[in-house]
């Protein structure tokens, strides 16, 4: 009976965690086939859009390779580490809280157990520029593959531009 209750609790936690994560999921813009396969799913490049949850007025777009074939379809193939990133100011910038240099903005699993992709955020206080870095890592070793994008914080309309340094945690 104990095992059944524990299994039910794990199932509920897993299901509710999945629903909570959906709010942060990026929006798929499009996919482009890179390797055509007749009898299994194609390999593709997928481009996504993601709004920074802490910094209103900033949107990032990233492109990731998606492995084709049956292993890729089932989630057993290890995804490649090449990820491109572009972030832009798309409206007036406002901060909903403070953040640390290198704080996670978004995280996604790229293989069943070992690899994850991360987009982290920082602030170049001297130039009043938000800096975004995307990279993938493994439990044992990281990957040198990365991409950086910067967003100079500019005034929007009549509002003065906020200073990102004012929202950095010490």
Question: Model-predicted segments: where are they?
Answer:
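N-terminal secretory signal peptides
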Residues: 21-86
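Bacterial N-terminal signal peptides that target proteins for export
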Residues: 1-6
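Short, low-complexity disordered leader/linker segments with a strong preference
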Residues: 15-16, 20
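Generic structural motif
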Residues: 50-52, 65, 90-92, 137, ...
